[in-house]
Amino acid sequence: MGSDFKAIPLIDISPLVGKIDDPSMVNDEDLLQVVQMLDDACREAGFFYVKGHGIADSLMKQVRDVTQKFFQLPYEEKLKIKMTPQSGYRGYQRVGENITKGKPDMHEAIDCYTPIEPGKYGDLAKPMVGSNLWPKYPSNFDVLLENYISLLRDLSRKIMRGIALALGAPVDAFEGTTAGDPFWVCRLIGYPVSTDIPEEQRTDTGCGAHTDYGLLTLVNQDDDICALEVRNQSGEWIYAKPIPGTFVCNIGDMLKVWSNGIYQPTLHRVVNNSPRYRVSVAFFYESNFDAAVEPVEFCRERTGGVAKYEKVVYGEHLVQKVLTNFVM
């Protein structure tokens, strides 16, 4: 939320996607231009679109389509993968079960996380131990989503390499103990038409104003429904209008801490005033689950020499949010 931006920048990241893992990439002018655009976007808006990302438009649409087909199933069928504390907070949640700042959100969703084996991370991860609950229908759901998530993990890693360079850090600064084993979250979200929600439950907000927890979010949204809004420094809400074939990206809380506030996450919300059901698939690229994220030295030096934020263990941050996010 660094400026009074009126629009969200669009960045063609194809030079970065193609060359960021090449040791000679520091001399590539096209790649360095993308890095500069990432820096500008992270400072000014905290949001940006990416094209040239290498994920097929047909795959992005297929993921949205199977998500919509699942939400069209009878309620009893959807409840077969119902989210519970026993499921590690993975699975289906009905409209109004997710809460933002005390108010129910008018969406339904499937929540997926990096699978966690019992005992991994000790007590830190105990509430989230488990594997993802994939629906039986549509029949290709699990294979499709697992492939999609794998591709987005790698794309996110490449974008974070560009963001590392934008901050003046080594290209692999977000690897190793920070995000060498990145945790991920994927939320498949459906926003019903408001008139389809019982009046006693209805609010005007599909998802209340919030910032994201981790490093980077990539949103695959319907091509033709405006609903995602981003707040600029003056408090105006700016539409993140759909641009077919792009991801809407935004930075999160962990990047704010790591950069000592050089990059700030931006408040955003979803208001679905469309007469049609809306689908959005959000992929969250996080630090290592057990990473202790704190302002790094060279970012402190660039911001007055003092850490503006205390150390945060990402897994503690996530578990605290998850345990207070739902009414079941």
Swiss-Prot record:
InterPro entries: DIOX_N, IPNS-like_FE2OG_OXY, IPNS-like_sf, Iron_ascorbate_oxido_reductase, Oxoglu/Fe-dep_dioxygenase_dom
Cellular component aspect of the GO annotation: cytoplasm
Tagged with keyword Oxidoreductase: yes
Description of what induces expression: Induced by cadmium.
GO molecular function: 2-oxoglutarate-dependent dioxygenase activity; L-ascorbic acid binding; metal ion binding
Tissue localization of expression: Expressed in roots and shoots.
Catalytic activity: L-homoarginine + 2-oxoglutarate + O2 = 6-hydroxy-L-homoarginine + succinate + CO2; melatonin + 2-oxoglutarate + O2 = 2-hydroxymelatonin + succinate + CO2
Activity response to pH changes: Optimum pH is 8.0.
Manner of cofactor binding, per the entry note: Binds 1 Fe(2+) ion per subunit.
Annotated residues for binding of 2-oxoglutarate: R278
Thermal characteristics: Optimum temperature is 30 degrees Celsius.
A Pfam family it matches: 2OG-FeII_Oxy
Reported cofactor(s): Fe(2+); L-ascorbate
PROSITE patterns, alphabetized: FE2OG_OXY
Enzyme Commission (EC) number: 1.14.11.-
Localization: Cytoplasm
EC supergroup of this enzyme: oxidoreductase
Domain annotation Fe2OG dioxygenase: ranges: 183-288
Binding site for Fe cation: H210, D212, H268
Similarity comment: Belongs to the iron/ascorbate-dependent oxidoreductase family.
Physiological role: 2-oxoglutarate-dependent dioxygenase catalyzing homoarginine 6-hydroxylation thus producing 6-hydroxy-L-homoarginine. Guanidine (Gd) is in turn synthesized by the spontaneous conversion of 6-hydroxy-L-homoarginine to (S)-2-amino-6-oxohexanoate (RHEA:79843); guanidine is a nitrogen-rich compound that can serve as a defense or signaling substance. Involved in melatonin degradation. Catalyzes the hydroxylation of melatonin to produce 2-hydroxymelatonin.
PANTHER family referenced in this protein's UniProt entry, alphabetically: 2-OXOGLUTARATE (2OG) AND FE(II)-DEPENDENT OXYGENASE SUPERFAMILY PROTEIN-RELATED
Protein name: Homoarginine-6-hydroxylase 2-ODD-233
Organism: Oryza sativa subsp. japonica
Gene: 2ODD33
